[in-house]
Amino acid sequence: MAFLSEEIDEPDTIYHEGLNASLSDGVPLPFVMSVRPFEPDDPWMLDRRISQMRAEGRNIFDSMKIRMASDPAAGQAVALEPTSYFKGLVTNEFCLREYQACDGLSVDGTSRAFPLSMVPKLSRSRMSNHIGATSLAFDDDGRLRLCVTGSAAAVAAGKITSSAAGSIDMADIAGASSLTQAVADAITRELVEETGLDETVAVETRIIAFVRHMERGGKPEFIGVSRIRGRWADVGNSIDDAERPFTEGHVVLDAAALGLDGVGRWLAEQSGHTSYALRSAWEFLFHAHARQNSALPGWVGISTV
């Protein structure tokens, strides 16, 4: 296990180099889905917290999600359970916060996420831990299309972020032959919604990393690299009205011309305007690209310099 961030003001992300190398090589993760849904320790807090957020003007709605109930390992089935977006709001999203649940009762979200100041295995975690996914998407010319998050976004509003980000829905897992396939399918769906990608365009996504985000209670996330067939200028349409509050616009970088180092310098220059999700995803892409015998350089068409 390793920590990605070495900066004091950056969140911490933990990962396992061996697992990520296996994912980059295309080794699938099988899964076993439970019918028993996850329940938070204090289910009564759900209605109270949702009512508070809606009273604050937050336009939130619930949806079914997929929870990781065991740590991933190459060749081993990952245990999954049904959960929901709202259940994450009273578990993972309380991390680094103290929540006044009611008169006389204060909930320390950090202690619940990390009992005894330790990061629990996913099998022992009492967080909702619904699975997230993010991707960097390149076209045939090596151009990278990034999103600018809108004011309604729950995370990193107004920041430049990755090409697509979201979470795994029940529909993504139905019929999937592996968890990694379900993640890739979810990323394709998010690309259509967030970049305006024509849904008839072929997309190939390779999963390159699995991480857990400490500032969100150890929430699990997969990082991918996507290749679209065509040019963003031709297949990147405008987003629909429902997505506009969440995606304000787009930034396109000529990554093939800039090279990995050039994009890295651009990210450093724009550090105040970019999300941690984008910076960390690029770091994992850089590591996967540099691995001996990596297929990424030829696949995305980007050199180091």
Where in the sequence are the language-model features?
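N-terminal leader/linker segments that precede catalytic domains of diphosphate-processing enzymes
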Residues: 1-189, 197-305
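Short alpha-helical functional segments enriched in proximate histidine and acidic residues
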Residues: 194
